[in-house]
Amino acid sequence: MVTRYLLAAAFAALSIGTASAAEPPPGKVTVVFDRPIPNIPGKSMKGVVVEYGPGAASPSHTHPKTAFIYATVLEGAFRIKVKGQPEKIYHVGENFVEEPGSVHEVSANASDTEPARLLAVFVLDTGEKTLVTPIKK
């Protein structure tokens, strides 16, 4: 009887570990710059540092429809897929852009053992507060 309970507890622990392993941990986003662009009324530039631990990823998402985004990898490597484009891995010093209205289908650390960090610079409407909107499944 005790053996049956121990086996049940072991299977329960394994299934909990498997369920949590299916969802990668989220990343951390820190705003490092936010300023109106003086010669373009109504537009601002906002810089954010995106940090992913090993194996971390963000769910599919969009950014504000007015946002043009330039990103450069500062550390590690990022696996990126924007709708309509092939998935690609970007390494330190490489960069990419996201056009206004793009759907960011994949944003993940390309490594399961090393952290990754990038700087993303948004040009967007002044006063826009929501930088990321998850896509509902």
Please provide the spans of the model-predicted regions.
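Histidine-centered metal-chelating micro-motifs
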Residues: A57-P59, R79, E94-N109
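Short acidic-glycine-tyrosine-enriched beta hairpin
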Residues: I37-G42, Y52-P54, G84-G101
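Sec/Tat signal peptide C-region and signal peptidase I cleavage site
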Residues: G17-E23
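Bacterial N-terminal signal peptides that target proteins for export
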Residues: M1-L7
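A short glycine-rich, His/Asp/Glu-containing loop-to-beta-strand
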Residues: P25-S60, T66
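Ligand-binding loop in jelly-roll beta-barrel domains
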Residues: P86-E87, G101-K129
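Bacterial N-terminal signal peptides
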Residues: A8-G17
